[in-house]
């Protein structure tokens, strides 16, 4: 059993990107659905769909590549807040990822969102990961 579903999700996507898989399968949780939705909105993945198998829900994520050499759109994914060490940030001190070329995914009281949207709304929260 996986204790940190977010790290597991990021690792599965990172591994699939390295070997240039088109689709990756991830166990569906509320958090993984929210993060996947943000990745789609921000253009890091093509699409995703939810499917059932033996009463378990899974996410099928279609990864996005650019050019003929199929370079992954996602260059790096870094887990920030971990179960052993939570990292929180106030609205005025939300991190910038590569001068806003990347995103930070923040878990706030209003839901999971990017650092830019959280800054817009003036709320802070737990910094889950950086993606660029």
Swiss-Prot record:
Pfam families: Ribosomal_S8. Gene3D superfamilies: 3.30.1370.30, 3.30.1490.10. The keyword Chloroplast applies. GO terms for cellular component: chloroplast; ribonucleoprotein complex; ribosome. SUPFAM superfamilies: Ribosomal protein S8. InterPro entries: Ribosomal_uS8, Ribosomal_uS8_CS, Ribosomal_uS8_sf. GO terms for biological process: translation. It is found in: Plastid, Chloroplast. Keywords: Chloroplast, Plastid, Ribonucleoprotein, Ribosomal protein, RNA-binding, rRNA-binding. GO terms for molecular function: rRNA binding; structural constituent of ribosome. Its main location: plastid. PANTHER family: 40S RIBOSOMAL PROTEIN S15A. Part of the 30S ribosomal subunit. Belongs to the universal ribosomal protein uS8 family. HAMAP family: Ribosomal_uS8_B. One of the primary rRNA binding proteins, it binds directly to 16S rRNA central domain where it helps coordinate assembly of the platform of the 30S subunit. This is Small ribosomal subunit protein uS8c. It comes from Trieres chinensis.
């Amino acid at each position: 059993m996986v204790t940190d579903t977010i790290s597991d999700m990021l690792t599965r996507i990172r591994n699939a990107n390295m070997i240039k898989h088109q689709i990756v399968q991830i166990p569906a949780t509320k958090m993984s659905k929210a993060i996947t939705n943000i990745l789609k909105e921000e253009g890091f993945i093509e699409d995703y769909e939810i499917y059932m198998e033996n009463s378990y829900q899974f996410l099928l994520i279609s990864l996005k590549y650019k050019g003929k050499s199929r370079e992954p759109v996602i260059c790096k994914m870094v887990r920030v807040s971990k179960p052993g060490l939570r990292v929180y940030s106030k609205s005025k001190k939300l991190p910038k990822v590569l001068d806003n070329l990347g995103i930070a995914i923040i878990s706030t009281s209003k839901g999971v969102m990017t650092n830019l949207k959280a800054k817009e709304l003036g709320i802070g929260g737990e910094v889950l990961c950086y993606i660029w």
